[in-house]
Amino acid sequence: MTLPLLVVLSLLNGCAEKEKFIVYGSTQNESEVETLIKEEDYVDRSTVIQYDDSMLVAVQIKPWEKWKKTKLEKKLQKKFEKKYPNKDVFVSADYKIFYEANKIKKDQMEDTKLSDKITELKELAKEET
């Protein structure tokens, strides 16, 4: 009797919603950024890294929207550039960039390494396109 209950509970726990929005670095406009991303229904998860005058927005697109990934990425890029004209904004829907951005957040990098890592991720994204 307890085994089926344990199985059901573990399945429900596995289906629990993970954190969908993560901001790392400067939190001065965290709620604005979160609102911008939540307005787009095609975004499944996102990680935003803000450092000085640059912002890296890594998103995961919902499965049925992946066919339009580049178009949606450009749309989000324009939206962020319009909202933050004085920041160097970079938006990517590439999973590798999303993974690395989450790794940066998890590792809690120091400022000197953070700047280098963001530059490295931008170069990686340009290579893949």
Identify the residue ranges that each predicted region occupies.
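Short, surface-exposed ligand-recognition loops at beta-strand->loop->(often short) alpha-helix junctions
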Residues: 22-28
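C-terminal low-complexity, charged extensions that often adopt amphipathic alpha-helices
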Residues: 77, 81-129
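Short, non-transmembrane amphipathic alpha-helical segments
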Residues: 30-38, 66-88
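Bacterial signal peptide processing site
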Residues: 16-18
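Post-signal-peptide N-terminal segment of Sec-exported extracytoplasmic proteins
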Residues: 35-70
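Catalytic cores of large soluble enzymes that bind and process phosphate-bearing ligands
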Residues: 25, 68, 113
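Sec-dependent signal peptide recognition
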Residues: 1-6
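C-terminal motif of bacterial Sec signal peptides marking the signal peptidase cleavage site
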Residues: 11-14
